[in-house]
Amino acid sequence: MKTALVIGGGFAGCAAAHQLQLLGGWDVTVVERAPFLGAGVRTRYYGGHPYTFGPRHFLTPWEHIYHYLNTYVPLRRCQDHQFLTYVEPDERFYSYPIHADDIREMPEAKQISEELSAINTSAVQRLTPEQLAKLTRSELRNLNNASLAKNFEDFWIYSIGKTLYGKFVDQYSRKMWMLDDNKLIDDFTWSPKGVTVKEGPRAAWDTAISAYPIAHNGYDDFFSIATQDANVQVSTEIERYDIPKRTVWIKGEKKTYDIIINTVSPDLLFEKCHGELPYIGRDLHAIVLPVEFALPKDVYFVYYAGAEKFTRVTEYKKFTLHKAPTTLVTLEIPSKQSKYYPLPIESEKAKAKKYFDMMPEGVFSVGRAGSYLYNVDIDDTIRHAMEVRDQLKS
């Protein structure tokens, strides 16, 4: 039987262990530093309320990923999910994504309309008659200059104009990433078509599946199912790595494996020889309120786009459907005390690639931390694990 080491027991690590279990013929060891599996997706409790470390609803455009997880953790669809953003200078909550009906109520409605029109006109003028002829009326109306952007700030301004960018994005993004300038963000993994103003229904997810586990303990059963055949070692640190030889030291014992699947930051595997990879963390403050619900119907969480220290308030009963006369909300405050989000900066991604290039055949690095990509969610970690399985099969 071949041997596999999975470094990290978060969702990515558990998903990887499960794919090896389904494949068969693998003796799998999962090593996790925390005293439990699941990382921030693990259900915790405060005042009797179940919650996770930040909202962890399941989002995916892939039906087969949804059906896979739904098989082991039955899911409830949350297509009614709406976002709000608080804009303090306006003393108003607005829908997010930005909605056309809200723009009409904004103090700068005329200015915003002129900016959007100018962007659209400029974008149309850049196209040839042949290109224009291929576009629908809706596509023409949504044309912008985002494809010309060189950084995050330009991307938004070229999409929606300076006024909306200032209301919804500028301070929020700098706060979220703890940066002084959004121009430092130059990872263009978002759509080159830019951001468009939403019309029609206000539900946030009309092109993706949005869901959450039905069970009171959330995703926890998946972590047990996925690792039931594995040798799971929690509260355990890997003391030393020799990745070129697929060898590690655990509790003073040297162990070599046929494959290694890494789900932690890749710099840790090589003693940060190319420099440390930066992350942004979160401080999470749980608060129980003496009301049954705090947020409006269908609103699961609220963004705060201004000078507030916190970025988001989440009401977990909207996800969990927990029954109680009280409700639990959390405040998320960006922090450097933990490492949750890889920075979307190309120079840091290039640094991460240096570590990936040092990994030999038989060593895989997956998940948000393992791939050093911010825009990796639960569905992506499952997909990464399936891709590793497919490579091993071939």
What are these regions (language model features)?
Residues 2-30, 389:
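N-terminal Rossmann-like FAD-binding beta1-loop-alpha1 element of flavoenzymes
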Residues 12, 36, 267:
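Conserved Rossmann-like nucleotide-cofactor binding loop
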Residues 21-45:
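Glycine-rich FAD pyrophosphate-binding loop
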Residues 23, 239-244, 250-358:
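Mid-domain catalytic core of redox enzymes
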Residues 47-134, 138-143:
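Dinucleotide-binding Rossmann-like beta1-alpha1 core, especially the glycine-rich loop
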Residues 67-71, 155, 164, 297-298, ...:
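Structural/interface elements that position substrates and couple domains in central-metabolism enzymes
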Residues 92, 108, 113, 117, ...:
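Active-site/ligand-binding neighborhood in enzyme catalytic cores
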Residues 342-394:
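C-terminal catalytic lobe of FAD-dependent flavoproteins
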